[in-house]
């Protein structure tokens, strides 16, 4: 089941249009792509196409007349039960009931591959996400980034793309020096030295604790080094420790990366200098005001690439974050040959989007090969009370603390209950509440209820794997559940192509609700109705498989018992 029903219907509408034109029922015109969507109101079929509303001016005919001609010439298909023209010119399609119920067997046959598609055609997509500065523990903002990126990677893989997950370690910027100075101060203080804490240093107990641990493990060896050398060494040691902690936290969130790419590699390999030279040769680099600038007609203002010592009042030139972005784009799209590079960034980086795309274009690359997702902030709440956080001040809740309090499943699910471009609240109390108000509990409970139902059937002597006559599935709640199950491939396609993984949580909640309605309306195990029971057990198994598949794509466990 790797082909979307929606696409097959669009093809039928297109063929109907072509046949009508050949028979001169419609004039010749060039049609835009046929759009097929799900009607908002029940009773308007399973699918609808508004294409005729777009064709009126081209055909010089009313949309309804165009729709009638297309509907009359659409070829028959086993999955189409009824075609009708409605309203001002919609073509409504109702799926054939026999074909619909037969899909229960197809879903069970597909098994864990149900929902997989081939729309990616094996193209190489890289998703780079989290990539938090290695100067402190991950917070809930980083957790949202992590959940968005990992779920998107799951969806892209299911859609048929070859996917690589990457974490970009920012270990070449000025923040690394500030980090090293902060650690040095706390390290020296733990050894009894009166060392002032840097004005722009990183606050927080974790810096104090790191300094103490390094003092315990290494004694005063860093005090014997020249201060600059000690700061540099402690900065590297601090980054190593933070990255180890980040890896542990992300593993607890069931996230693993294929690659950990260090920013410093861009400079040590000479790639930054080479990319800068390419831009210079093409006329995109100018030098003024003691700095090196990138200039491009698509940008409202030039972007600084390198600041000189006179500007930053430090002993060496200092590349900006944007400088690294230039070389990094070349590394991804050319040296490693990804067809598309997807970045997951916080919305505070919105100003960098145009610069990165302009730099890619200036290097001779198609900027459309770069996709940048911008996600909004998360407000951490406990009921109605907001929990404040600030990495610099040290007053923040870490991802580790969040994991310890609510666990990985509520984090992964609830951080995807809003679109990425919407600011969202994460309620710590709701995340642990065992009620229908908690969306992850509601969905997981549906899976556990199905599993319990199947165990009960086995206890009653039923072979739940036995085939049944699915044509007996005629109750509206049964048919509604089949229809909802068959939406999964479309949700995968929509989420993957629009880079919108939140559709998956919406679908999971909807599927759970439709199953609960089926469970309420239809007695599954009825000894006096053996054939009906076998058919409903098949549908129940298909629902469990689909719910488990959805939760797996979300990176959330599908419990057998709750």
Language-model features: locations:
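Non-catalytic interaction-recognition regions
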Residues: 1-102, 109-112, 116-562
């Amino acid at each position: 089941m790797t082909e979307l029903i929606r696409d097959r219907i669009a093809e039928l509408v297109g063929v109907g249009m072509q046949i009508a034109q050949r028979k001169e029922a419609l004039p010749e015109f060039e049609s835009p792509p046929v759009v097929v969507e799900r009607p908002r109101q029940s009773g308007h079929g399973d699918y609808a196409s508004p294409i005729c509303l777009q064709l009126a001016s081209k055909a010089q005919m009313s949309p309804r007349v165009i729709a009638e001609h297309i509907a009359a010439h659409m070829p028959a298909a086993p999955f189409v039960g009824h075609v009708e023209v409605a309203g001002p010119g919609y073509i409504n399609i109702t799926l054939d009931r026999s074909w619909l119920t037969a899909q229960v067997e197809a879903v069970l046959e597909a098994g864990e591959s149900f929902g997989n598609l081939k729309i990616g055609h094996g193209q190489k997509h890289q998703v780079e996400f989290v990539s938090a500065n290695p100067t402190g523990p991950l917070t809930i903002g980083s957790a949202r980034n992590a959940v968005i990126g990992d779920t998107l990677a799951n969806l892209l893989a299911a859609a048929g793309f070859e996917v690589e997950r990457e974490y970009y370690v920012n270990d070449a910027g000025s923040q690394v020096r500030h980090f090293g100075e902060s650690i040095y101060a706390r390290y020296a203080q733990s050894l009894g030295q009166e060392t002032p804490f840097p004005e722009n240093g990183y606050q927080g107990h974790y810096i104090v604790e790191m300094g103490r641990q390094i003092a315990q493990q290494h004694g005063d060896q860093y005090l014997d080094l020249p201060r600059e050398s000690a700061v540099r060494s402690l900065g590297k040691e601090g980054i190593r420790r933070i990255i180890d902690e980040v890896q542990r936290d992300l593993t607890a969130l069931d996230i693993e990366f294929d690659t950990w790419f260090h920013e410093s590699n861009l400079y040590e390999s000479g790639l930054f200098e080479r990319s800068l030279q390419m831009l210079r040769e093409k006329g995109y680099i100018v030098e003024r005001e003691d700095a090196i600038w990138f200039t491009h007609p698509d940008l409202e203002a030039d972007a600084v690439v390198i600041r000189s010592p006179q500007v930053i009042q430090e002993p060496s030139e200092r590349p900006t974050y944007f400088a690294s972005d230039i070389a990094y784009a070349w590394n991804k799209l050319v040296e490693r040959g990804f067809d598309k590079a997807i970045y997951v960034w916080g919305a505070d980086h919105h100003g960098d989007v145009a610069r990165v795309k302009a730099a890619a274009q200036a290097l001779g690359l198609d900027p459309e090969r770069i996709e940048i997702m911008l996600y909004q902030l998360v407000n951490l709440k406990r009921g109605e009370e907001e929990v404040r956080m600030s990495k610099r001040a040290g007053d923040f809740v870490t991802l580790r603390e969040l994991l310890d309090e609510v666990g990985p499943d509520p984090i992964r699910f609830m951080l995807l209950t809003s679109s990425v471009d919407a600011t969202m609240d994460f309620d710590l109390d709701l995340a642990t509440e065992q009620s229908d108000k908690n969306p992850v509990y509601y969905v997981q409970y549906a899976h556990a209820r199905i599993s319990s139902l199947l165990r009960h059937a086995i206890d009653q002597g039923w072979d739940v794997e036995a085939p049944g006559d699915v044509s007996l599935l005629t109750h509206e709640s049964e048919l509604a559940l089949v229809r909802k199950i068959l939406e999964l491939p479309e949700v995968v396609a929509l989420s993957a192509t629009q880079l919108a993984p939140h559709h998956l949580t919406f679908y999971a909640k909807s599927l759970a609700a439709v199953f609960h309605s089926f469970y309420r309306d239809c007695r599954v195990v009825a000894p006096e109705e053996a054939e009906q029971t076998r058919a409903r057990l098949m549908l129940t198994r298909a629902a469990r498989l689909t719910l488990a598949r959805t939760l797996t794509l979300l990176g959330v466990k599908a419990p057998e018992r709750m």
